[in-house]
Amino acid sequence: MNDEARQPGECGCGCTDGSSAKGIDRRQVIRIAAAGAAVALAPLGALAAEERPQAGDLFVADDVEKDPVAIKAAEVQPGKPMLAFPFDPASKKIRNESRLNKVILVKLADSDLDASSKERAASGILAFSAICTHQACEAKTWVSADKSLVCFCHASKFAVLDAGRVVAGPAPRALPMLPLKLQGDQLMVAAPFTTPPGGAG
């Protein structure tokens, strides 16, 4: 078949005759617009999950992945620290896409807290980053004898009663604290982390 005998669309280049061009253009525009909207909106949920805790966030147990139920202050018992992630109560988005958002909730007697700690506590509960400041392992082992948190990787030890100060091991700085307040009987984030969470490098 010579070129003159070929019908529109038969040349293999994807061209069409003029009668159908407008219809195809409209469909392409619709598909492109829909794809663009999906791309634009998709990161919003991911961003919310990666964002650091925000004032007004509530907390959910760290093993919950959807349909979060807010942790109540009464659920955090003395000597039994609880791992948690913050979540946005409006969108129900759990901020668990970054492990740097994981916190450990520790219940103490009011008489154990100094003035500075009381300002960041709610019902005797303090929140610390659960991520060691050395190499970003989890500092979650509770030592009741001296009320400290220990990282299982390199034995860095943090004093809960002294704003997470390093008392042993290679960690270069204190555990960040996350100030709390109460909303009814639920624990709520009062302010951002006191310092950025994460390891030294």
Which residues make up each language-model segment?
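N-terminal twin-arginine translocation
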Residues: 23-28, 39-57
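N-terminal secretory signal peptides
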Residues: 1-24
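Short Fe-S-cluster ligation motifs
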Residues: 158-199
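N-terminal pre-ligand scaffold of iron-sulfur
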Residues: 49-131, 136-141, 182-201
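Acidic, glycine-rich flexible loop segments
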Residues: 133-140, 144-156, 161-174
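Sec-dependent signal peptide hydrophobic core
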Residues: 33-37
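Processing junctions and N-termini across compartments
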Residues: 5-9, 126, 131, 145-147
